[in-house]
Amino acid sequence: MLGPGDHVVASPAVYEQVLEDAGVLSAERRREAILAGIAEVEAARPGCHVDTPKKVFEEVINLCEWPTVLVGTFDEEFLKVPHEIICESMLTNQRYFPIYDGEGKLTREFVVVSNSKPENAERVIDGNERVVRARLDDAKFFYEEDLKISLDEFRERLAKVAFQEKLGSVLAKSERIEQLALAIAREAHLGAHLAADAARAAHLCKADLVSNAVVEFTSQQGVMGGYYATAMGENDEVAHAIRDHYRPRFAGDELPEGTAGCIVACADKLDTIAGIFAIGEPPTGSSDPYALRRAAIGIINILRDRLPIDPTSLIDFALELYSEQGIEFDAAEVAQQVRDFFHGRLVSMARDEKIPADTVAAVSAVHIIAPSVFFARCAALDEARKNDVETFDNLATAYARAAHISKPELGAEYDRSLMGEAELALADASEAAQTAVDAALAAEDYPAAFAALAAMRAPIDRFFDEVMVMDEDEQLRDNRLKLLNRFEAVFSGIANIGELARKK
């Protein structure tokens, strides 16, 4: 474009130089030129920042041959429009980079990367300002028109918007989310005021899907609803919950700001997971068209960091709401599938966090799906093992040995009158450990729980050293097996220590 005509490349060695002489920089040189230009823009405006989203930035690099960084402006009136749709319009439609001031507020200026000679800068800037003005006029119009309609009225229109072919409308989904939000608030023992805020936010959270702004700028769903909620007079907790309820949208994304937002986000995601499983379309292999894995990970992150509750009963309730809607499925079977799905995500996340595989397996074996409990137990067991490797290695071996020969059908009611000293010592240690473990679990003191388990190492070692479990006397043999069942039972609510004895 800047170097018309033919340009002969005599050899591979001169290829890039010929391109440069013809007005075409290499990709790396284009990147450097744009970054240098942006740095100059920021240096001339102390405290300001040019927003360059990676995807758009890479597109710009590949759309120009000889980049020139210029700065344009738009009218002050457009700053009254939510900055999210202003920026999306500039970035998506024109690939202009917005400039923010030192306080993080959008300014009237934006960066244009032009593919023309610097001497044409004034004309290029004028043309781009006219283009952006037209785009922002549209965004302003959509926003102002939306403000004329209440979110409740928008919500009524959701009856004509399908959520999923077999699962009904988005209006029906919003009704389920509202009920789930109240159930989550109860499960988390939150106050009536916060529960009411969560329910109100859930009631309105999908309303903006039919607004003009979101129809035009689909990635701003939720965000625009938050603005409209504020304009309607909803309190900040409700407005922010509507704004944030799609979070986290991807790995590393922020969690919702407020508690109500966390509740609505979990309710929305859980409703989707429950519904898709209910119609028999769960993720398979690499196929996950409804992004259920991402939704489950989002729920897990929220429950782990912000709402330390067990989702088990909530899964049942989410499925119950679909059943009441007339969706037919085996509730018990699907509930188990959803629990297993969450469990699988927990295990995957733990491994991604480099928690030892056998530690994860030990905690996973007791089928905990409360994220805060699962990760706390993994951390406590891992720390206990590091602090006393020999004790836990030996305890794991003894547990695995006991599990190998045990007969669960015999129960755990043993007869002390048939026991020798080693057996009595193990019986006493098991009962003491059970009491200590129960108290520790009630207090969510997982290090104390694993310390109580570790205290059984010496008694179980002595038992296997001194006692012939499989005695010829059936009465003695069964009593000893019952004692081993009792020993195993102490572990049943916290971790399967035998997993630590498996070869890696």
Report residues per predicted region.
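Amphipathic alpha-helical "coupling" segments that flank catalytic cores
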Residues: 1-504
